A protein has these predicted regions:
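Glycine-rich phosphate-binding loops that contact phosphosugars or nucleotide phosphates
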Residues: 71-220, 253, 300-346, 364, ...
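Anionic-ligand anchoring segments at beta-strand to alpha-helix junctions in alpha/beta enzyme folds, i.e.
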Residues: 44-59, 68-124, 151, 246-292, ...
Length: 397
C-alpha cells in the first residue's frame, strides 16, 4: 500500500502510539458512555496531573514547555468552542484573580472576524478535546501569523491543533465517546490549575510553600470528586423532579457562574430542556421576568465571599414561585430554606470547588436525559465541527 498526499506525492506514514487500552473504549457495563465517562473523572484527573508535579511543584519539563512561555507574555488569550471555551472561562477567573495577568477568552468561531489585538507578547492557548475543532484550528493559525506564541490543551495526540501549536499540554482523559463532553472538560480544568500555579510561582505571586499548598489541594480533587459520585443517587432523585420542565434557569456568581454555563449547556444538549445560565446579579435586568410558579432554578453556592449575595438572589427567585435546586459547599450550608432541594458538596478551598460542582451538574444532566428515555450518548441534530467549508476561511489562509 502506498500513501500519497493531495498532490499525489508519495509520503511516509507517521506512526503514533495510543496510550490507552482497547477496552477503555467500551461501556464496561454502563448503559451509556456518558455515565461511564463521568465516573472515570477521578482517575482521568489523577493521570493528567501526576507526571506534572515534581517535589510538590508544577513542572512541565516532560512536556517540553519552557518557563519563559509563562513569563514573557503580557497577556493571554484562550480560543475555544463550546465546553472547551467554558473551561477557558474558569481559567480566566483564576489567572486574573491569582496571577493578576490580563486573560481574554474568545469564541474561536468569532475570533478572526473581530480583529483581535494579538502580537508577539501574547500567549494564545487553544483548547479542544479532539484537536480537530476547525474554528479553533483556524483561530490558532491566525494567531501564529500575528506572531503569537501558541500553546494547546488537547486530548488527542498528533491531532491537527497539536501539530500546529508551538507547545502542547495533553490531557489524559482517554477516549471520550459520548458527544457531551465530561472528563475532557475536567481534565482541561486540571491542566489550567497547573498553569495557574506555575505562573503564580514564576511571577513571584506565590512563594514556593504557597505553590505547594495550592498543588496539594489540586491533588485532593480525585478523592473529593469520588465523594460527589457517591451522591449520585441523591442527584438522581432531584433529576426526576425536573423531567417535565420546559424551561430551566441556572444562577450563580463568580466561578459558580462559569461552571453553570457549562452545566446549562450539558442539560440542554442531552435533555432538550431549554436551559439558560445567568450571573445572579443580572436577574434584575430582565431575566427575572421569566421566573413564574414552579419554574426550576438551579443555583450553586461555593464561594464564601459571594455567599450572602447569592443567597439573597435565590430568595428573590423563590419569592416569585421558583422551585430551587441548590448545590452548595458543605461548609456554607448552615441555615437554608427547608423548601430548597439541596445537594451538599464536599469541601475544598473555594477556588477548587468548580471541579466537584461540575461533576454534580453533569450527573444532573445525565439523569434527566436517561430518565426521559433519550439516547444520552447521541443527542439529536449532531453536527461535525471538524469539517471545513473552504469559502468560510479562504480570506484568512
Amino acid at each position: 500500500m502506498v500513501l500519497t498526499d493531495l498532490n499525489d506525492n508519495v509520503v511516509e506514514p507517521e506512526f503514533l502510539s495510543v496510550d490507552w487500552e482497547l477496552n477503555s473504549a467500551g461501556k464496561n457495563g454502563y448503559p451509556f458512555y456518558m455515565e461511564k465517562e463521568i465516573m472515570e473523572q477521578p482517575e482521568a484527573i489523577k493521570n493528567t496531573i501526576k507526571d506534572r508535579i515534581v517535589n510538590g511543584l508544577p513542572d512541565f519539563t516532560s512536556d517540553g514547555v519552557p518557563d519563559s512561555l509563562f513569563t514573557d507574555c503580557d497577556r493571554i488569550c484562550v480560543v475555544a468552542c463550546g465546553t472547551a471555551m467554558h473551561a477557558g472561562l474558569v481559567a480566566q477567573a483564576l489567572v486574573k484573580s491569582i496571577v493578576h495577568v490580563q486573560m481574554d477568552v474568545e469564541l474561536a468561531s468569532e475570533f478572526m472576524y473581530s480583529d483581535p489585538v494579538i502580537d508577539e507578547k501574547t500567549l494564545v492557548i487553544a483548547v479542544s478535546q479532539s484537536g480537530e475543532t476547525i474554528d479553533t484550528l483556524e483561530a490558532l493559525k491566525y494567531a501564529k501569523r500575528q506572531g503569537a506564541k501558541c500553546l494547546s490543551v488537547i486530548n488527542v495526540k498528533g491531532s491537527s491543533i497539536a501539530r500546529e501549536s508551538d507547545y502542547v499540554l495533553y490531557t489524559a482523559a482517554g477516549p471520550e465517546i459520548a458527544v457531551a463532553s465530561t472528563k475532557a472538560y475536567t481534565t482541561q480544568l486540571s491542566v489550567f490549575y497547573l498553569v495557574v500555579a506555575k505562573m503564580a510561582l514564576l511571577r513571584g505571586v506565590y512563594t514556593e510553600e504557597q505553590t505547594k499548598s495550592f498543588i496539594a489541594e489540586l491533588e485532593r480533587v480525585p478523592e473529593v470528586m469520588q465523594k460527589v459520585l457517591e451522591k449520585r443517587r441523591d442527584i438522581h432523585v432531584i433529576a426526576k423532579k425536573i423531567l417535565e420542565a420546559k424551561d430551566l434557569f441556572m444562577i450563580g456568581r463568580g466561578l459558580d457562574y462559569s461552571i453553570l454555563l457549562e452545566g446549562s449547556l450539558k442539560l440542554k444538549e442531552v435533555s432538550y430542556i431549554h436551559s439558560e445560565a445567568y450571573a445572579s446579579g443580572e436577574l434584575k435586568h430582565g431575566p427575572i421576568a421569566l421566573i413564574t410558579t414552579n419554574t426550576p432554578v438551579v443555583a450553586t453556592v461555593t464561594q464564601e465571599k459571594l455567599m450572602s449575595k447569592e443567597l439573597s438572589n435565590i430568595k428573590e427567585v423563590k419569592s416569585r414561585g421558583a422551585d430551587i435546586v441548590l448545590f452548595i459547599k458543605e461548609a456554607l450550608s448552615g441555615d437554608l430554606d427547608t423548601e430548597y432541594q439541596v445537594i451538599k458538596l464536599p469541601d475544598m478551598q473555594d477556588e477548587f470547588m468548580v471541579l466537584p460542582a461540575s461533576v454534580a451538574l453533569q450527573l444532573l444532566a445525565y439523569y434527566v436525559s436517561s430518565d426521559k428515555g433519550f439516547d444520552v450518548d447521541k443527542p439529536r441534530n449532531p453536527v461535525s465541527y471538524t469539517h471545513l467549508r473552504a469559502h468560510e476561511t479562504d480570506q484568512y489562509l
